Amino acid sequence: MNRTDELRTARIDSLVTPTELAQRYPVSSSVASHVTDSRRRIEKILNGEDPRLLVVIGPCSIHDLNAAMEYATQLQAQRQKHQARLEIVMRTYFEKPRTVVGWKGLISDPDLNGSYRVNHGLELARRLLLQVNELGVPTATEFLDMVTGQFIADLISWGTIGARTTESQIHREMASALSCPVGFKNGTDGNTRIAVDAIRASRASHMFLSPDKDGQMTIYQTSGNPYGHIIMRGGKKPNYHAEDIAAACDTLHEFDLPEHLVVDFSHGNCQKQHRRQLDVCDDICQQIRNGSTAIAGIMAESFLREGTQKIISGQPLIYGQSITDPCLNWEDTEVLLEKLAAAVDSRF
């Protein structure tokens, strides 16, 4: 008889279960309290109950745990310095959506060579999240794959659904199940309406299918996530200007949704020129000083060293430099945080 299934797949390995990984890298009571508390602080900012600014900042993607921990240690000092004005959260992205092809992140390919040691990647991701949270720094990530969230979501304080997946029904269902606040990016073309639709969908209850923590395929009912919000990330042109923010708020108001959003300094808003993130920062700071309450948070891409590098077989990587989108360096990061904190002073 002719085979009619699995004609285009080859088995690589068995996947560890979320329970097994969590037993190897368990959450302590102090880390659990830290994650819970940081989520609550973020929720209050998104609801307008806390005038401080949510700042999600860090490397475009994680590829080197040592460099990531050095960055986290320096970021913790900035958290303490600016805690009265900023709620700083570290960007810890382990999955990378691709327009066509490319390295898909630490979880999929931790060795950067196409060997796809996913179990090792999951282990590295969970270990790093534990260490960063133990430092006292909350973590943020994009939820891209429908399964991998089961391995790390208990350590995430703020999540995103990316521009390429905001319109996806299964990602909206996943967002409705997540225990952290979730931001939805506008589409790659700049369309913010799809993000508003995603917020509305994720607030509702859904049925969806997923493996549970022990790997058993399960039918889940979600209760809905009341903390969905737009992330303005630009598109064919930037959308961080005051008129863009006002237009997005008008759409939110139309559907009786909270008129609070997050502005991404990178991606379409910097037109893929990473140093322009500083220009976006200046504009947003002025909007805050002018009395804008709609801007609840910002995102920025920064690392220890400026720019980006290519993965070249047989050649060592430059320590502390991105291998995906170019990032601001640490010195610029400190300047950016200082400017944001000074602008938020006007809210007090």
From Swiss-Prot:
It is an enzyme of class 2 (transferase). Belongs to the class-I DAHP synthase family. It comes from the Bacteria. GO terms for cellular component: cytoplasm. GO terms for molecular function: 3-deoxy-7-phosphoheptulonate synthase activity. Pathway: Metabolic intermediate biosynthesis; chorismate biosynthesis; chorismate from D-erythrose 4-phosphate and phosphoenolpyruvate: step 1/7. InterPro entries: Aldolase_TIM (IPR013785), DAHP1/KDSA (IPR006218), DAHP_synth_1 (IPR006219). The lineage of its organism: Bacteria, Pseudomonadati, Pseudomonadota, Gammaproteobacteria, Enterobacterales. GO terms for biological process: amino acid biosynthetic process; aromatic amino acid family biosynthetic process; chorismate biosynthetic process. NCBIfam families: aroFGH, PRK12755.1, PRK12756.1. Pfam families: DAHP_synth_1. This is Phospho-2-dehydro-3-deoxyheptonate aldolase, Trp-sensitive. Stereospecific condensation of phosphoenolpyruvate (PEP) and D-erythrose-4-phosphate (E4P) giving rise to 3-deoxy-D-arabino-heptulosonate-7-phosphate (DAHP). Its EC number is 2.5.1.54. Keywords: Amino-acid biosynthesis, Aromatic amino acid biosynthesis, Transferase. It catalyses: D-erythrose 4-phosphate + phosphoenolpyruvate + H2O = 7-phospho-2-dehydro-3-deoxy-D-arabino-heptonate + phosphate.
